[in-house]
Amino acid sequence: MNFTPIFAGTKTCYMPNSVSLHRVLKASPEKVYRAFTDKSAIASWLPPWGFLCTVHEMDVKVGGGYRMSFQNFSTGSSHSFGGKYVELKPNELLRYTDKFEDPNLPGEMMTTVELRKVMVGTEIKIVQENIPDVIPAEMCYLGWQESLEKLMKLVEPNIPDA
């Protein structure tokens, strides 16, 4: 079982099979929320470095579902996953399930994304829980760090139309 530190104020808690991330982005909550709910946007930033993403289905509403695949650009191998949107508050909160199609990666994860407007942009907090035992939580954490770096590069520039 993996234990990942969860930071609550100045206290560090350890939760099995979970990761917790926190960032501040120089972009509005509306723009960050759109990056999570637009097919083309999420395909550009969610996969970690070296992976491509295909979004097969994305119905962003409570009870709606999504399905996507990540393909390793080096080897060509891919894995597919999907889930359901459990809770949505535009520009504030997304909570959704994640389930791999591979039977060797059992269980259902829960991902919670909280957005809060701050003076310089948006504070984003992400918690992913119930990561399958066969996936090191550190690997998920590293993947999320890479994804959030790509998200930042998508949402922070303010490029006017020509």
Residue ranges of each PLM-predicted region?
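Beta-strand/loop substructures that line and gate deep hydrophobic ligand-binding cavities in soluble
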Residues: 22, 95-145, 162
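Hydrophobic ligand-binding cavity/cleft-lining segments
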Residues: 2-52
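Short beta-edge strand/loop motif at the mouth of beta-sheet-based domains
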Residues: 20-21, 40-78, 161-162
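A short, structured loop/turn motif at beta-sheet edges
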Residues: 29-30, 58-62, 86-93, 114-123
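Short, highly charged C-terminal tails/helix-capping segments
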Residues: 154-162
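Hydrophobic pocket/interface hotspot
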Residues: 32, 42, 66, 85, ...
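Intrinsic-disorder/low-complexity, polar/charged segments enriched in Ser/Thr/Lys/Arg/Asp/Glu/Gln
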Residues: 16-22, 29, 53, 65, ...
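Hydrophobic/aromatic beta-strand elements that line small-molecule binding cavities or substrate pockets
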Residues: 23, 55-58, 81-86, 109-116
